[in-house]
């Protein structure tokens, strides 16, 4: 009896591509379709439709794979996704994948074996796992190649952060970027720099490779010991901004009089530190909710109006930005 594996070998495609063709579930290119049809005819293959139906029936499980749940932004994102999915009768498996590829692979294996209905993740792993046929929605770090995604308007956010400090009289700015392999961070960083150049404001770029508070503190110490006499800082996240505030206090400098600083995310604790952090707000909860709604529509074969959803951002004025001087 001819198997799917034999058809795949004959057609020169993967087993999962043959499975999608037979189940009529998921994308198969015209070229692959023709090869499979020829192979099926040549090998006289007859699929077991009842077994295929059982195999392709999806479990009501959604994987939620996030990079660092110690960062308050991501638990709020998870809350938005989980509340919607639970209401729809779905279970959520939360995976703290960090930046380790092995952890991601381990979670993916479990989700594949469980025949999960979908995945919500900050990392688009289609390039690493091209045969993965579980519907996936990317959140926060959405690239051009992502099929489905929910993200904030990072370009506007980066520009807005720069505009706020320039309007408040910035003369020399430290622009801090998070890890540049993250699309969202990269877009913000470029937009902030473009605005500073446009307004001819002096700046220097610094690169942070961590979201760990203690590591960021070390980086902040080096930046502020730079003897550049920065009067303003654009931080890539509220966590970064808080680490810089801690270091500015240690140096006995006043915020915002000596150094003003703007964060990004508007996590809950940003309003409780001293001084309260001025920041760019993006809704982590709404991002998770929109991603969950999108994965639910995909899993239940509903019409999808937009495959990529961009959420607005806005400035939240608190105490770390100088008041605009009156003329």
Curated annotation (Swiss-Prot):
Gene of this entry: rbsR
Protein role: Transcriptional repressor for the ribose rbsDACBK operon.
Species for this entry: Lactococcus lactis subsp. lactis (strain IL1403)
Name by which UniProt lists this protein: Ribose operon repressor
SUPFAM superfamilies, per the entry: lambda repressor-like DNA-binding domains (SSF47413), Periplasmic binding protein-like I (SSF53822)
GO terms, molecular function: DNA-binding transcription factor activity; transcription cis-regulatory region binding
Record keywords: DNA-binding, Repressor, Transcription, Transcription regulation
DNA-binding segment(s): 4-23
Domain HTH lacI-type: 1-56
């Amino acid at each position: 009896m001819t198997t799917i594996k034999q058809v795949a070998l004959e057609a020169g495609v993967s087993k999962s591509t043959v499975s999608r063709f037979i189940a009529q579930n998921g994308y198969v290119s015209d070229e692959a379709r023709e090869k499979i049809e020829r192979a099926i005819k040549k090998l006289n293959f007859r699929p077991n439709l009842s077994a295929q139906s059982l195999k392709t029936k999806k479990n009501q499980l959604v994987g939620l794979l996030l990079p660092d749940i110690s960062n308050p932004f991501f638990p709020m994102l998870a809350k938005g996704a989980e509340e919607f999915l639970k209401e729809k009768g779905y279970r959520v498996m939360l995976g703290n994948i960090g930046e380790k590829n092995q952890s991601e692979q381990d979670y993916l294996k479990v989700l594949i074996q469980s025949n999960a209905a979908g995945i919500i993740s900050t990392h688009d792993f289609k390039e690493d796992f091209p045969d993965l046929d579980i519907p996936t929605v990317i959140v926060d770090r959405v690239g051009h190649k992502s099929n489905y995604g929910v993200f904030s308007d990072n370009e506007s956010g980066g520009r807005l952060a720069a505009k706020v400090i320039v309007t408040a009289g910035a003369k020399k700015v430290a622009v801090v970027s998070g890890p540049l392999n993250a699309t969202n961070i990269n877009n913000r960083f470029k937009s902030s720099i473009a605005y500073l150049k446009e307004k001819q404001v002096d700046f220097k770029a610094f690169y942070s490779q961590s979201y760990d508070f203690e590591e960021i503190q070390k980086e902040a110490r080096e930046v502020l010991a730079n003897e550049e006499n920065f009067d303003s800082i654009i931080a890539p996240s509220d966590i970064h901004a808080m680490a810089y505030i801690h270091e500015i206090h240690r140096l006995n400098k006043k915020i915002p009089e000596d150094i003003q600083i703007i964060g990004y995310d508007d996590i809950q604790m940003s309003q409780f530190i001293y001084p309260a952090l001025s920041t760019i707000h993006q809704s982590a909860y709404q991002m998770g909710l929109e991603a969950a709604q999108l994965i639910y529509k995909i899993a239940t074969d509903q019409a999808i109006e937009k495959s990529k959803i961009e959420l607005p951002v806005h400035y939240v004025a608190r105490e770390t930005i100088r008041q605009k001087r009156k003329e």
